[in-house]
Amino acid sequence: MASSLLFSFNNPNCTHPSIDELPLPKYNNPTKPNNVVLHRNKPFLMPRTTMERRSQFICSASSVLISPEELEDDESDQEETLVFDEDLDTRREDTRPLSQVWREIQGSNDWEGLLDPMNSHLRREIIRYGELAQACYDSFDFDPHSKYCGTCKYQGSEFFEKLEMAHLGYQTSRYLYATSNINLPNFFQHSRLSKVWSTYANWMGYVAVLTDEEEIKRLGRRDIVIAWRGTVTYLEWIYDLKDILHPANFGDDPSIKIEAGFHDLYTKKEDNCHFCSFSAREQILSEVKRLLDYYRGEEISITVTGHSLGAALAIISAYDIAEMKVNVMRDGSSGKMTTVPITVYSFAGPRVGNLKFKERCDELGVKVLRVVNVHDKVPTVPGIIANEKMQFQKYLEDTISFPWSYAHVGVELELDHTHSPFLKSTIDPSYAHNLEAHIHLVDGYHGKGRKFRLVTKRDIALVNKNCNFLKPEYGVPPNWRQDENKGMVRNSDGRWVVPERRIIDGHPPDTAHHLQQALNVATDDGMGGGFPLEAI
């Protein structure tokens, strides 16, 4: 029965689905552009009817182009690859304004009734935050031949513009750094040159705030986003994990523990390095406190996103903000305490802490939506011995303090890359882990047992940015994203050189002040969990 539902790729008379057959999403305002589309060029896909048509394709960084003559497809020849539900109406839209339902979309009810079938608002928000996480990869200098390896290639003031993401309406408020002087050697990137920008530091992501008034109105609030860099393809960092739980020490309960490598990455600092003089934790607490004070009185949300190891840091930092009560604000006029909601969009993330950590996140109201591919191995570690799927996990932790017990936090959105007709079969584990592939799967997911069908018209060429996951008949070369001439420019002597960067954004001068303010919040009125600045 199941086999009859599958499309046969070996049949030469069959063709792949045309992008023009995919239904257009409905909008309340048809003149308003789709704000979640990173590349606004319309993607065209290659029919499989004649292999000679490949030569007519020109691949660029933004789209795959096909001549107008090729757009005349015979609809009778176009079939969907996977057919699970013939009654699926992919044109169904949530007609409520996002500004009215944003708390629900951000997980106030743990996404109940929004994932199956997939809510149209939620789909676009997952994609939007996935792209904000992907920006960490697209802007990171991976080149070991550059003395700037390990930095962000763009200054904060031009970050979103350089990445063609200015339409999202965010502005970076600070960059995040971490010391590489910890036991995760396969995660950090270092230059092979002797003279480098920093011996210890690696750029880890950014904090940004929504400043565009139209977007604030559309979303219904001012959004503060924290995006963490992970690992775009290489999975060697997994082998660096010691599978040792370390007390979080962000609150009063020593039984709340997180994986030791993640803890070190988040809390360690290097006094001799300008970029690592504050730990990643201190940078986060300081900046979130500063922004919340600055925008006091407004409707605000805090959204944290990350992929792979970055997803682990996203959950840890969200928990930390809530545990330290930095998101609890007192209204200046009424004196009423309000709590800013915290949401995490995690992509392909590992387990972070023990069951007590998971339970404490739930108590604090930290909402986590974990987007995973069932074929990806990263979400299965650490915690192979004892995890949330075990019936007796709580007994192991409470009775014998079992040291290798881990539990996932939040709600899981389970995807399967074999359901996409655009992706090829592969045994390469990095493909199943790829962030762009996850975003692609979200675009076509409609619920369990429903056929895969793209909705937002997001360019499928983006999948092959850093891998070779698309089927070859779509004419998109692998690993196509790179800077022009790999960043080399001609100097005044006519020689090709790596251009100097005048400024590498470091820590704002008021970091220590706002950090101390954040720590004071945790100790005021008996709210608990605070630390003096010198002890953090």
Predicted regions and their residues:
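A conserved cap/lid and substrate-binding interface adjacent to the catalytic center
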Residues: 167-169, 173-305, 324-336, 341, ...
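General structural concept
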Residues: 112, 116-118, 123, 143, ...
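Structured beta-strand/turn binding interfaces of compact recognition modules in eukaryotic regulators
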Residues: 123, 129-138, 157, 208-212, ...
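Terminal and linker regions of secretory-pathway proteins
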Residues: 130, 140, 147-158, 388, ...
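Catalytic nucleophile loop
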Residues: 311
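Serine hydrolase/lipase
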Residues: 2-125, 222, 258, 264, ...
